[in-house]
Amino acid sequence: MVLVQDLLHPSPATEAKQHKLKTLVQQPRSFFMDVKCQGCLNITTVFSHAQTAVTCDSCSTVLCTPTGGKAKLTEGCSFRRK
């Protein structure tokens, strides 16, 4: 009997489409990131699914705004995944 799908070695495309608990190895899809302010170039650590608006400590500009899921970065801000 030959299986159509290989259950032990799924392709990365099918793993990305599945729910986070239904994958072969469970792992969260959220992460922390360093966000660089566009005005003062100060770096702030932000959670990817932040539920409140995050502002810069020194110049108090808004770095990201919450949405239903992931936080949306303001235009001009760059980020690096930790």
Curated annotation (Swiss-Prot):
The lineage of its organism: Eukaryota, Fungi, Dikarya, Ascomycota, Saccharomycotina. GO terms for cellular component: cytosolic small ribosomal subunit. Pfam families: Ribosomal_S27e (PF01667). PANTHER family: 40S RIBOSOMAL PROTEIN S27. One of its GO terms (molecular function) is RNA binding. Its cofactor is Zn(2+). Zn(2+) binds at residues 37, 40, 56, 59. SUPFAM superfamilies: Zn-binding ribosomal proteins. Binds 1 zinc ion per subunit. Component of the small ribosomal subunit. Mature ribosomes consist of a small (40S) and a large (60S) subunit. The 40S subunit contains about 32 different proteins and 1 molecule of RNA (18S). The 60S subunit contains 45 different proteins and 3 molecules of RNA (25S, 5.8S and 5S). It is found in: Cytoplasm. This is Small ribosomal subunit protein eS27.
